């Protein structure tokens, strides 16, 4: 009798372990989606509370930063001082969120975080340091990076479903910027040429 109980307990534990492993991706994705939605809601509420003067100053600082990038061939290699300046731009609450991206074709809405460290990329889309801040306008090339295929978060998993002509939207402070996909290519991490800034164009990669 005692032996049968032990076998039953072991079988239950094996079942629970298996069920936990099967449910982990779904539960984890739901949890991360909830926090992403909360981050976007919090960001939206904060921007709505901004007075016009503060909003204009934040935009002016970001646009000034972008102009400096045009004349900086070493912009992807930051000094500590430059990193500190970068982290403070478009950061309303000190949590590193500078806006959010919407991709209607794949029903995706995600916060955009400063930098592309692993902590940020597990829960948000990262903005590549050294690329233009998402202000739009000529002479800017904003580069965003996100994980695909993570078991714990959907993020950019469905990005390969996009096709030329689809649009995506960046929402930063009080502005909405809509971009159209004009080409799809794979960028080598060591080849920065596709990320160059064209003084006459407004790009987002």
Residue ranges of predicted features:
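N-terminal Lys/Arg-rich, disordered targeting/topogenic segments
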Residues: 1-3
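Solvent-exposed, non-transmembrane regions of membrane-associated and secreted proteins
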Residues: 5-9, 14-205
